[in-house]
Design a protein with these regions (language model features):
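Short, surface-exposed beta-edge/turn micro-motifs
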Residues: 54, 72-75, 140
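Short, charged/polar surface micro-motifs in flexible loops or helix N-caps
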Residues: 50-53, 61-64, 81-84, 90-93
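Short, conserved beta-strand element in jelly-roll/cupin
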Residues: 70-91, 99-104
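A short, N-terminal "cap"/entry segment at the start of jelly-roll beta-barrel domains
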Residues: 1-58, 64-66, 159-163
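A short hydrophobic beta-strand segment most commonly corresponding to one strand
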Residues: 138-156
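Short acidic-glycine-tyrosine-enriched beta hairpin
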Residues: 90-128
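Short beta-strand His + acidic residue motifs that chelate non-heme Fe in jelly-roll/DSBH
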Residues: 67-68, 85-86, 114-116, 124-126, ...
């Protein structure tokens, strides 16, 4: 028997689903990251998984985001496309939420620290207390590991299987 590995992308994915034997599918969280990203506006932070305060956010990257920062480390896994991450120091005293990331004003991002160009399968650290932004010439998908924050959107009723 031959097996074929197929990697999903924003342009080509199969939703899949939860197959239950003797239970209610509503008891299980199932969503397809590519489907969530395909329906999202660029740079929305849409939770696709949650464990206590920790979340995985699906982010559609298209164009250049505004500057963001968090008081804690985050990581971003590129699932589709190519994403350039740009990092700058953050203005001293810039307020940040206790959890999650938030947009920061353009002038709060000061000295250029560097950049990372990441493609499918590349994991990029988004360091605590530093400004970052991401950009992509075409649609790309990130999975961001973070803590639930003020801009995290929960759309369980829209994205999870219910029957």
């Amino acid at each position: 028997m031959a097996y074929e590995t197929r990697l999903a992308s924003l342009a080509s994915y199969e939703k899949g689903g939860v197959e239950v034997i003797d239970d209610d599918p509503k008891n299980y969280a199932f969503s397809n990251i590519f489907e969530v990203a395909s329906l999202a506006k660029p740079f929305e932070l849409i939770a696709v998984a949650k464990n206590f305060e920790y979340v995985l956010e699906a982010v559609r990257v298209e164009g250049t985001s505004g500057w963001r920062a968090a008081a804690h480390d985050q990581s971003a896994l590129v699932l589709d496309g190519e994403v350039e991450f740009t990092f700058k120091t953050l203005r001293a005293g810039q307020a940040l939420p206790e959890s999650g990331s938030a947009g920061v004003p353009e002038d709060a991002a000061e000295t250029l620290m560097g950049r990372v160009v990441a493609r499918r399968g590349h994991l990029t650290l988004l360091p605590a207390g530093r400004a970052y932004r991401y950009s992509s010439p075409g649609p790309a998908v990130l999975l961001v590991q973070t803590v639930e924050g003020p801009e995290t959107q929960f759309r369980w009723a829209e994205i999870c299987q219910t029957a």
